Amino acid sequence: MSCYSPCQTAACGPAPLANSCNEPCVLRCADSSVAIQPPPVVVTLPGPILSSFPQSTAVGSTASAAVGSSLSAGSVPIGAGGSLGLGGFGWSGLGRGLCGTLGRGNLLC
C-alpha cells in the first residue's frame, strides 16, 4: 500500500507572542485488490482515508514578568487589565498615561 502526506506541517502564520493553529489534514491511500477463491473473483476495496487534526502552539515573551515591565506587541501595550500590567494594583489606563486611586478614593493622574 502506498500513501503520501500532502499536508503541510509548517507554522500557520508569523511568529507572534502566542499562536495556536488547528487545521484538519486528510490522507487518501491507494485502493487494494483481493482475490477470493473458489471461484476466483477479484474485488476492489476502496483505500482507507486517514484524518487528523494537528495542532501547533507557540508561546513566547518579549519582556520580563517582573512587576513594572512593559510588554507590548507592535507598539501596543498589553498587560493584566491596566497600563504596564498594574491592573491589580488599582492603576488603570491604556498605556498612554497612569491614573490610579490614592488613599480614600482620590484619583491621581
Curated annotation (Swiss-Prot):
**GO CC annotations, alphabetized:** intermediate filament
- The gene behind this protein is BKJ
**Species of provenance:** Gallus gallus
Q: What is this protein called?
A: Beta-keratin-related protein
Q: Does the keyword Membrane apply?
A: no
Origin superkingdom: Eukaryota
Could you tell me the keywords of this UniProt record? Acetylation, Keratin
Q: Which InterPro entries match?
A: Keratin
Q: Which residues carry this modification: N-acetylserine?
A: S2
The entry assigns this protein to a family as follows: Belongs to the avian keratin family.
